[in-house]
Amino acid sequence: MGRMLTIRVFKYDPQSAVSKPHFQEYKIEEAPSMTIFIVLNMIRETYDPDLNFDFVCRAGICGSCGMMINGRPSLACRTLTKDFEDGVITLLPLPAFKLIKDLSVDTGNWFNGMSQRVESWIHAQKEHDISKLEERIEPEVAQEVFELDRCIECGCCIAACGTKIMREDFVGAAGLNRVVRFMIDPHDERTDEDYYELIGDDDGVFGCMTLLACHDVCPKNLPLQSKIAYLRRKMVSVN
């Protein structure tokens, strides 16, 4: 028999006039290799079919199951219960995003708005002919672009960001990472001055306080620390 876990889950439906924010406590018997995602499924299947949380892939790829796990933004599907020695686990929705219900938040609209704000697409003067082979680039450059493209938009870096909590319009590490991704892509013809117009202010790269919680919590281990520093140096050199 496994040990008994105490799971405290935040419950609240902002669309309901009678719902009030509160914690609901559940006792779950731990199983080998149990994840928080498995725990939440057990709770929903056994105790609370009304519990809301998001998931798709269950493999750390889609980023849907981001939530606060004992105060740390993490993916439920990649967090093992055995890592919590006292067996007490508190789950809350990610801050900085609109709450849908319980542990479910709207990251989609935020990331869509961020993508539009930083103009997250290739800017080129000539029209691309899709019938021709794509222009070749050096393998090292392609690998660097791919590395930054691994962002799964889970929202963990945004939830961990002190600046984002204080400044609603801050683009966050995800936005700054997206800018660097296009900055190093040789297919994009924008200049440093063009990027400065997008993120050269306190809601962009100069709002970052370099606390680097984003770097610490990123489930894909993206090089956020070095890329934000690179972007800051680039933007400082513009003026």
Curated annotation (Swiss-Prot):
SUPFAM superfamilies assigned: 2Fe-2S ferredoxin-like (SSF54292), alpha-helical ferredoxin (SSF46548)
GO biological process, one term: tricarboxylic acid cycle
Keywords: 2Fe-2S, 3Fe-4S, 4Fe-4S, Cell inner membrane, Cell membrane, Electron transport, Iron, Iron-sulfur, Membrane, Metal-binding, Oxidoreductase, Respiratory chain, Transport, Tricarboxylic acid cycle
Catalytic activity, reaction form: a menaquinone + succinate = a menaquinol + fumarate
Protein origin, superkingdom: Bacteria
Gene Ontology molecular-function annotations: 2 iron, 2 sulfur cluster binding; 3 iron, 4 sulfur cluster binding; 4 iron, 4 sulfur cluster binding; electron transfer activity; metal ion binding; oxidoreductase activity
Record-annotated 2Fe-2S ferredoxin-type domain positions: 5-95
Start and end residues of each 4Fe-4S ferredoxin-type domain: 142-171
Protein family (similarity comment): Belongs to the succinate dehydrogenase/fumarate reductase iron-sulfur protein family.
Protein known as: Fumarate reductase iron-sulfur subunit
